[in-house]
Structures are given as C-alpha cells and as structure tokens.
Design a protein with these regions (language model features):
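A conserved structural/catalytic subdomain of Rossmann-like adenosyl-cofactor enzymes
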Residues: 34-413
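S-adenosyl-L-methionine
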Residues: 2-35
Length: 417
C-alpha cells in the first residue's frame, strides 16, 4: 500500500488505499465489483507467483475455480486469477479489454480447464497477439483479450483472432507502437466481424479526407518555396500536374492509392533539385555565391544562410509528403484486404473460429494457431536505394562533423587553450 501511495504521489495524485496496509487484489475485494461493471479495462502484472491459495479462494470472484495450486498451497502463476476477476466483474451486458502475457493463451493444466469454461460461455469476443517491444523496458510480446457478455446471438459461438505481430510502427530500436491509422485499421477488422460496415465506410471517407488535406498542405508549402529553386525544379512540374489531376478527380479512396508511387518520385526529384541548386552555389566564389543567393531572394545575406533556409523548407515539404504517403500506405493495407467492407479471413492476420474449431485446437486462444503464417508482403522501399541514401547521409554528416571539429580546434588555438 505504501508503494502504491508513493507511486501516486510521484504522479502528482492523492490516493486513498481502500484495503489499507493489506491492499492486495488477490486477497481482498475492496470495491465489491462482482457483476457490477459495464466496462473493465486493465493492464495487470504478468506471471505473479506465490499467491496464497486459501486466501484467494476466500476472496471469491472465481467463477471457474482456482488455477493450479502447488505443494506449498500457492498459485504459482496468477494470470488466470486476473482473467477470472475481469470476467466476474462484468454485468449481464458488460465488456472487458485487458493486456495479458502471451503465454496465457495456451497455458496448460488447470489454466486450460478455466479457459475451456470461459470459451464455452460464448463471451470471449476477440484475442489479439501483439509484437515485441510495445512496453518501455519490457521486450516480450503480449496479447489483448476482449470479453463481451452482450455479444450478438449469431457471434456467441465464434471468436475473432487477430495476429498483429507483423503490423506496427518502429519508434526506435527498443520500442514499437501502432500509429493512429494502424489502430483504426485494427478496429476496422473488429467492426466488420461485428457487421458494423457503416464504421468501416466512414473510415474510408476519413482516409480520403486526410490525404486530400495532406496534399493541400504540402502543395501550398511547395508553392511558397518553389521559386527559390531557381529553375532547378523544372522536372517537378509534370509530376505536380499528375498529382493534382488525381486529387481533383478523385471521388473515393481507391482513386487516391496511385498517388503513393507518384509522391515517391516527387520526393526524389525534389531532393535532386535541391542538391543541384546547392552544388551550383557551393561551386561559386563566396561573393559570387552571395550575389547568386540575392538574385533569387533579395533578403538573402549570405549563400550559406540562404542554402540553409531553402534546405530546411524543402525538408519540411518532403516530410509532409512522407506523412501523406504513410496514410496512403495504411489505406491500401486496409482496402486490399477488405475492399468496400466485407469481412473475410486473411491469412496471417485474422480468422473467425467457432467454438468447435477451438476445441479441436485443445482450447488454445493463441491467434497464430488459427490465422496461420502471413505471406511476405512487398515493401515499396528499394533496399539498395535506401542503403545508398543512408550511406550518403552518413558521409555528409561525417564531413560536417569534421568541419565543425576543425572550427572548434581553430578557436581553441586562437584562445591559446
């Protein structure tokens, strides 16, 4: 309890631990929630051990009985205590969603018996596998469980399995996440499984609107900077016309999907135009370069400042184009699988299984057991091109670092240090 209060205080919150110094969900039902909750959402600690079986039994909320008890009269893994609690808290139409250790979907012995009873209620709605590195400092994969006591009658003997382990955005070497649009896509699978096609249709419209707005934003940004390219952006004109025509004539998301390849070419040409401009200016004498800069922008004071300003603005445009391409990529991911909005099992991604099929799999709730292995999807990024870009960028950064070090060394010499 003291640790809990301290944790709340660190986050600037006042707390009252209702169970006092003995606060422990396994041994106390302080809030008396059994059968009272419309919704339950939780991220409990995984794989807790040494839980006293007798105290846990006395605390109740175990509609399917205790998990396995060892010779020391302890529950050696409390995962199915949590799962039982969350189910027990729901009222007759309640819904639950919680994070759980990946191993819990297929654990054996008494866990399997509890899982069997749980599945036979017809209230297990969806199971989702999640990739590694979705938690800070915890690299292990996990699963998301969803219960729904108010499921439609036609879905009661079915469970939706989603394997999202290959679908995520890399934040850095040790952290992954779902982007806003990836979460919407995963939601869309559930909508279609439930027959909520209108939500899917609205999402397609949201994609269309977002891409149109992104286009307007980066096109306006390019318009303001294009004059600064001083004729080096001529190759961009026909591409810009093509892109504009597709956007203006589009009526739905499918008509915008071809933009992805065009925007990739557009970004490449934009970077090439900037490079050509910079190489020309860098090749001039200092005074000539200044005159050249002022001929393009009267407010320019030096070539270096002008180059930095133009480069920064072009990088911003390229970044906006990349963001637009990301939205298009996610729209394509969704529409290629579900078209205008009919649920279908997708190899390696999702599968609706009946309770009979789950029984055949020995009551496993591991999505990968049902969805099978996904086919390898082509990446629209060329590996060799990307590695070349990275190599060039590293060389540029190294060159800039060397110049900076020379400047620092020279300054130290002047200071006599």
């Amino acid at each position: 309890a003291k640790l809990c209060i301290m944790n709340m205080a660190v986050h600037g919150l006042n707390a009252k631990i209702k169970s006092g110094d003995e606060a422990n969900s396994f041994y106390h039902d302080a809030h008396n929630l059994e059968g009272r909750c419309d919704y339950v959402m939780a991220n409990p600690p995984f794989n807790v051990d040494k839980v006293k079986a007798e105290s846990t039994q006395n605390a109740g909320r175990l509609p399917f009985g205790l998990p396995g008890v060892n010779q020391k009269k302890e529950v050696s893994n409390a995962n199915y205590l949590w799962i039982s609690y969350f189910y027990a808290y729901l009222n007759d139409t309640g819904r639950a969603g919680f994070v759980m250790a990946a191993s819990a979907t297929d654990s054996g012995n008494k866990d399997r018996e509890i899982r069997k009873q749980l599945i036979q209620t017809g209230h297990v709605d969806c199971l989702m596998s999640v990739a590694n590195n979705f938690f800070y400092k915890v690299s292990l994969p996990c699963s998301l469980w969803f219960f729904d006591k108010g499921k439609k009658e036609e879905l009661k003997d079915k469970v939706l399995f989603i394997d999202s382990r290959n679908y995520y955005t890399v934040v850095d070497r040790t952290l992954n996440e779902w982007s806003e649009w990836q979460m919407k896509n995963l939601n869309a699978i559930v909508w279609l499984y439930r027959g909520e096609k209108e939500k899917y249709t609205k999402l397609l419209q949201d994609y269309w609107t977002q891409i149109i707005n992104d286009y307007k934003e980066f096109d306006a940004a390019f318009e303001s900077v294009s004059v600064l390219l001083n004729g080096y952006g001529e190759k961009l004109k026909p591409l810009r016309v093509q892109i504009s025509d597709i956007v203006k004539n589009s009526e739905d998301i499918n008509q915008l999907l071809p933009l992805n390849d065009l925007l990739k070419k557009y970004s490449t040409e934009l970077n090439a135009s900037l490079k050509a401009l910079c190489e020309y200016g860098d090749g001039l004498e200092k005074d000539e370069a200044k005159v050249f800069a002022k001929s393009i922008d009267e407010s320019a004071t030096t070539w270096d400042r002008f180059k930095k300003s133009v480069s920064t603005r072009i990088v911003e445009v390229v970044s906006q184009i990349k963001a637009c391409r990301t939205v298009i990529k996610e729209a394509k991911w969704l529409t290629e699988k579900f078209g205008d909005g009919t649920y279908t099992d997708v190899l390696g991604l999702c599968k609706v299984a009946t309770i009979d099929e789950i029984e055949e799999k020995n009551w496993s709730l591991t999505p990968g057991v049902y969805v099978d292995v996904a086919p390898v999807e082509e990446d629209d990024e060329n590996f060799e091109e990307r590695m070349t870009e990275i190599h060039k960028e590293l060389l540029t950064l190294q060159s800039e670092a060397n110049k900076l070090m020379d400047t620092i060394s020279a300054n130290f010499e002047v200071l006599g240090i």
